[in-house]
């Protein structure tokens, strides 16, 4: 890997994102599509941009992402995590601000499995007393 790019792996739920940070003008490319095309929801786009806005580096980098697995929310979270890790690789002094914002920690919440005898993970069948 060349010294001109920084790499970060991000994960959230079942989504995994590989993020490459290169000096540039602020283009974000996800699976060879622009951010606006890939994410229809504005909230997902906002989540992806959060670490860049916090570190005031929106126009400093071009970001290339390959993401797989999960849904829209999980993929957005995985990309955010990957961008955060790549930014820390680029400049370790950003770690404190990113940590305080809560972007460094991997969100460990996963879907709880369905149990036998229950309708969902915790929903029980209706109880009849008589």
Swiss-Prot record:
GO terms for cellular component: cytosolic small ribosomal subunit. InterPro entries: Ribosomal_Su5_D2-typ_SF, Ribosomal_uS9, Ribosomal_uS9_bac/plastid, Ribosomal_uS9_CS, Ribsml_uS5_D2-typ_fold_subgr. Gene3D superfamilies: 3.30.230.10. GO terms for biological process: translation. It comes from the Bacteria. Transmembrane segments: none annotated. One of its GO terms (molecular function) is structural constituent of ribosome. This is Small ribosomal subunit protein uS9. The gene is rpsI.
């Amino acid at each position: 890997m060349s010294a001109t790019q920084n790499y970060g792996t991000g994960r959230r739920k079942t989504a995994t994102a590989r993020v490459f940070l290169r000096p540039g003008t602020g283009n974000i490319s996800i699976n060879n599509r622009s951010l606006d095309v890939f994410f229809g929801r504005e909230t997902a786009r906002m989540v992806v941009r959060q670490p860049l806005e916090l570190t005031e580096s929106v126009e400093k980098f071009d970001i290339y992402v390959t993401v797989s697995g999960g849904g829209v929310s999980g993929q957005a979270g995985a990309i955010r995590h990957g961008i955060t890790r790549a930014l820390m690789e680029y400049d370790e002094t950003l770690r404190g601000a990113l940590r305080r914002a809560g972007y460094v920690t991997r969100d460990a919440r996963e879907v709880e499995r369905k149990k036998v005898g229950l309708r969902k993970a915790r929903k029980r069948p209706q109880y009849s007393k008589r």
